[in-house]
């Protein structure tokens, strides 16, 4: 009961003080229909952590089978999630945003020729396929030349990643596509309908201070806008999403 992890790391933010996309998410979840108590939050987080423990046990079962069948030295084990969960942080739940609780996920790998260690540069789930292909000796140029992402294998020996991580969102709670660029300590978020967001995750890991309106960060904003425009045609992106529905 005294576990600090049962409490949100960021207290609920009043609806009127939320950013535009978070307001849409709260409206999409019909936030006024529920009176979420502190006990509800703790129970929800406890259940989430219980799920993690359950998955951990099942991964142990898989590794046990690999060891008993003498396949562990010929197997690459990868643990990954496609998204996180806000779990009440900022008063938000589920996924659907670029905040760290939603977008940041674990990525762990073990197998032949993978030395134990850690890698702190931002990477993407898009990097998984190129990484596994290189570890398996497969050239994606021969079989899947259209594949996005970059191999993380150089990172196993300490090579730093220089490419930014790109993210897109155009699902529940969005009235237009959102895009995000994570480049080192910086996170930039853009939607044609909303004010821009810029966070310095080194000094503000909870993403509580949007630096985009601050003239002191005009250089960073200009650089991110150029990256954004080089990568996305936002009008075409919006049209493609609507036509696909």
Model-assigned labels for residue ranges:
Residues 1-122, 135-144, 207, 215, ...:
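Active-site-proximal cap/lid insertion segments
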Residues 29-40, 128, 211-245:
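Long, internal low-complexity/basic segments
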Residues 45, 90, 95, 104, ...:
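Basic side chains
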Residues 54, 58, 127, 131, ...:
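Charged catalytic carboxylate motif
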Residues 66-67, 155-156, 212:
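Hydrophobic residues in alpha-helical segments
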Residues 83-89, 110, 115, 126-129, ...:
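C-terminal cap/loop subdomain of S1 sulfatases and analogous C-terminal strand-loop tails that border
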């Amino acid at each position: 009961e005294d576990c600090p992890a049962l409490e949100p790391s960021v207290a609920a933010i009043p609806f009127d003080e939320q950013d535009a996309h978070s307001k849409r998410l709260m409206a999409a979840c019909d936030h006024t229909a529920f009176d979420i108590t502190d006990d509800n939050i703790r129970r929800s987080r406890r259940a989430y952590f219980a799920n993690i423990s359950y998955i951990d046990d099942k991964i142990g079962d898989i590794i046990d089978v690999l060891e008993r069948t003498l396949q562990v030295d010929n197997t690459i084990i990868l643990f990954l999630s496609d998204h996180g969960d806000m779990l009440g942080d900022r008063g938000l739940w589920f996924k659907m945003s670029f905040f760290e609780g939603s977008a940041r996920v674990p990525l762990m790998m073990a197998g032949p020729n993978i030395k134990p260690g850690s890698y702190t540069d931002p990477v993407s789930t898009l990097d998984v396929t190129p990484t596994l292909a290189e570890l398996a000796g497969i050239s994606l140029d021969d079989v899947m030349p259209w594949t996005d992402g970059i191999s993380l294998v150089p990172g196993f020996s300490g090579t730093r990643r220089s490419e930014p991580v790109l993210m897109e969102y155009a699902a529940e709670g969005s009235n237009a596509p959102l895009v995000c660029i994570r480049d080192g300590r910086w996170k930039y978020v853009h939607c044609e309908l909303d004010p821009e967001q810029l966070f310095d995750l080194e000094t503000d890991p909870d993403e509580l201070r949007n630096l985009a309106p601050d003239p002191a960060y005009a250089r960073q904003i200009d650089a991110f806008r150029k990256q954004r425009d080089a990568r996305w045609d936002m009008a075409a992106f919006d049209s493609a999403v609507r036509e696909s529905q």
